[in-house]
Regions:
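Early extracytoplasmic/lumenal segment of secretory-pathway proteins
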Residues: 24-91, 217
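Extracytoplasmic ligand-binding site segments that recognize negatively charged/polar headgroups
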Residues: 41, 78-79, 83-206, 210-220
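Mature extracytoplasmic/periplasmic domains
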Residues: 254, 258, 263-320
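Short, low-complexity disordered leader/linker segments with a strong preference
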Residues: 1-31, 343-344
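Periplasmic-binding protein-like
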Residues: 194-202, 240-264
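General small-molecule cofactor/ligand-binding pocket signal
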Residues: 57-59, 208-210, 245-247
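Extracellular/periplasmic bilobal clamshell ligand-binding domains
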Residues: 305-344
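A ligand-binding cleft/hinge motif common to bilobed small-molecule-binding domains
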Residues: 89-91, 226-243
């Protein structure tokens, strides 16, 4: 999910006697972890090795598609744990590349926040465990804004004319417009999507700028008083100005999830289960969450992590942007093109 809207972590403590099933390479025991660079603090990997005698071999990929290609070529083997984005997890499961989880081997699975479970890519949570969540949110300067912003619908308030900075993701901006209308972010009905476009055009007078990179800077330098930001941008903005106000929109969250799974032919499934359970231990999950800067998926770790990375308990609605039909996507793109032109 490193490239998207979007993410966080989990853990548990295993006794040394559990690890009798690990493969041996001489006296060495290894677990091959396949994910993006920078997803774990070295301290966590080192502590796992100290506790279990299993060395974590960190193998990186640059895109989800690269991961899927390599895992497919290996026929679900070579790697013991994979962490990737929600949409590619669906494909990996459909292609038979993911192990159906033995929940009895995961003592700490109950630590996972139910808000991020039962998603489209794994509706019964049979194959994956959420690791991190990216959540774009509204952030504003209460000293510069005269209204109390509670949701997406408030972005249309006339008092916010020429004051909003938006990220540049066409599906996400269409999506929050749909949520403000009581519709799904993944609406397929072209007529409804056209109405979304009409509503979006009404927002144009309030938009100061649209950009994907460092959007938070417009809020920090005073160019904008309200911003809709990706997770990393939210945390960066709050680090610079802790007096900014973060809004968890009352219409619900749009988010992207990074999930972890055990490949169907993983060389060492015992090691994989042990690592997965280990990082669902609250203290370990908190270290991982603070390190990667995505939102926490581990409710047992919430009190231990940076409070800016914990979604409030009263937020119970969320939706992931999914692929839609070609006709629906074409209308979403048309909405976006017309909206950007109106903002110029």
């Amino acid at each position: 999910m490193k490239k998207r809207v979007l993410a966080v972590v989990m853990c548990a403590l295993m006794a040394g006697s559990v690890f009798t099933g690990f493969k041996d390479a001489g006296d060495d025991k290894e677990l091959v972890l396949f994910t993006w660079e920078g997803m774990f603090p070295q301290e966590v990997l080192d502590d796992f090795e100290k506790e279990t005698g299993v060395k974590v071999v960190y193998s990186n990929f640059d895109t989800d598609e690269t991961m899927l290609e390599k895992l497919s070529m290996a026929k679900g083997g070579d790697y013991d744990i994979v962490i990737a984005d929600d949409y590619i997890l669906e494909t990996a499961i459909a292609d038979g590349l993911a192990e159906k989880l033995d929940k009895d081997s995961l003592e700490n699975i109950g630590n996972i926040n139910s808000l991020y479970q039962g998603q489209f890519y794994d509706p019964d949570d049979e194959y994956t465990v959420p690791y991190g969540v990216g959540i774009p949110l509204i952030v504003y300067d209460p000293e510069q804004v005269d209204i109390d912003i509670k949701g997406y619908k408030d972005l249309w308030d006339p008092s916010l004319e020429d004051s909003i900075a938006l990220t540049a993701n066409y599906r996400v901006i269409n999506g929050i417009t749909q949520l403000s209308m009581g519709e799904s972010m993944n609406e397929e009905d072209v007529d409804v999507i056209k109405k979304t476009g009409e509503k979006l055009l009404e927002l144009a007078p309030n938009v100061r700028l649209i950009q994907d990179d460092n959007t938070q800077n417009a809020l920090l330098n005073g160019e904008a008083s309200v911003a809709f930001l990706y997770t990393s941008q939210v945390t960066a903005a709050l680090a610079e100005n802790p007096d900014l106000k973060v809004v968890y929109p009352e219409e619900g969250l749009g988010f992207g999830i990074m999930g972890m799974f055990i490949p169907s032919e993983a060389p060492d499934k015992d090691a994989a289960y042990s690592f997965m359970d280990y990082i669902m231990q609250p203290e370990v999950a908190a270290k991982c969450t603070d390190y990667i800067g995505y939102y926490s998926t581990n409710k047992a770790a919430d009190e231990l992590v940076n409070p800016d990375l914990v979604v409030p308990d009263d937020v119970t609605k969320g939706e992931i942007v999914q692929n839609v039909s070609q006709d629906a996507d074409a209308q979403y793109q048309k909405n976006w093109t017309e909206f950007k032109a109106a903002c110029d």
